[in-house]
Design a protein with these regions (language model features):
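Beta-propeller domains with acidic blade repeats across secreted/periplasmic ectodomains
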Residues: 1-282
Length: 282
């Protein structure tokens, strides 16, 4: 929000009827919050060019705004719908996230305490001039106590949505190009455009899907619970903004990887104004 009205809210359903009963403002005024993950006594927030940690050490559900930490910096914003997104805790204890192919970034620790940008402040023009780890489309991870950042895989389009299956295999959903990928650390994957950093790549890793939907998917979540019928277990669910729907694919092991086959459309909205893009499993 360029107006300064961005808020991080805590919404609670206290009686389990599927409707929100309370609403609290955890923090407001953070410029362009694009990703959230709760942990370690606070909230990790993607607010390009920064990865912020906003503490709540007393547990009162109110951010301690004077103690915000800039953990990392260098994320680009050339294409706002491809910047830092989709935070998710991995089974290894690292914080995972995504970035799209049209927003070059160079990730590093900030100088000193770093700079927390305010709404309408100019974005730094020297973003790509410092030393750091290059990423321009891909999966990355950050260790919250060791303060380490690594690029996990490169490529894709503007991926949104990341999850693991019960055996720790990593999957992401993507837009425009085929919508689902099985991610292996170190992998170089199909790009929507541009060049790979490694000029010696003779081919890249392709999608695992054997079908197509309309173009923009996000919010990948693998269902591993018992509230739905058994046939839904271990399926991967994704929102699709152009179909105004929640779709599902069936993950089938094949060789050292997977094939994603078309599952039933889980939910088709009856109102075109509904555009889902983030899913969570309770």
């Amino acid at each position: 929000s360029g107006s300064g009205d961005s808020r991080i809210l805590i919404i609670e359903d206290t009686n389990g009827d599927g409707r929100a009963d309370s609403r609290k403002v955890f923090a407001e005024g953070i410029a362009f919050p694009s990703a959230l993950a709760v942990g370690f006594g606070g909230v990790f927030v993607g607010a390009p060019p920064n990865l912020l940690f906003i503490p709540d050490r007393d547990g009162d559900d109110v951010a301690e705004m004077d103690d915000i930490e800039v953990r990392l910096t260098g994320w680009g914003i050339r294409d706002r719908h491809e910047t830092i997104n989709s935070f998710h805790w991995g089974p290894d204890g690292w914080l995972y996230g995504l970035e799209g192919f049209a927003t070059p970034s160079k990730i590093r620790r900030p100088i000193g305490k770093g700079k927390i940008y305010k709404h309408n402040e100019p974005f730094p023009e020297d973003l790509l001039e410092a030393d750091g780890i290059d990423i321009n489309g891909g999966v990355w991870k950050y260790h919250p106590t060791k303060d380490r950042f690594e690029a996990v895989a490169h490529g894709f389009s503007n991926p949104w949505g990341i999850d693991y299956n019960s055996k720790g295999q990593l999957f992401i959903s993507a837009c425009v190009i085929p919508h689902l990928f099985h991610v292996v650390p170190g992998g170089i994957y199909h790009r929507q455009g541009g060049q790979h950093f490694n000029s010696y790549i003779y081919d890249d890793i392709k999608t695992i899907v054997d079908h197509r939907h309309r173009s923009a998917h996000g919010g990948a979540r693998i269902y591993m619970s018992d509230a739905f019928p058994p046939m839904q277990n271990n399926r991967i669910f994704m929102a699709n903004i152009h179909e105004h729907a929640v779709l599902s694919d069936i993950l089938v092991s094949r060789g050292s990887g997977f094939v994603a086959k078309h599952g039933e459309d889980f939910m088709m909205a009856n109102n075109a104004q509904w555009i889902g893009f983030s899913l969570e499993i309770g």
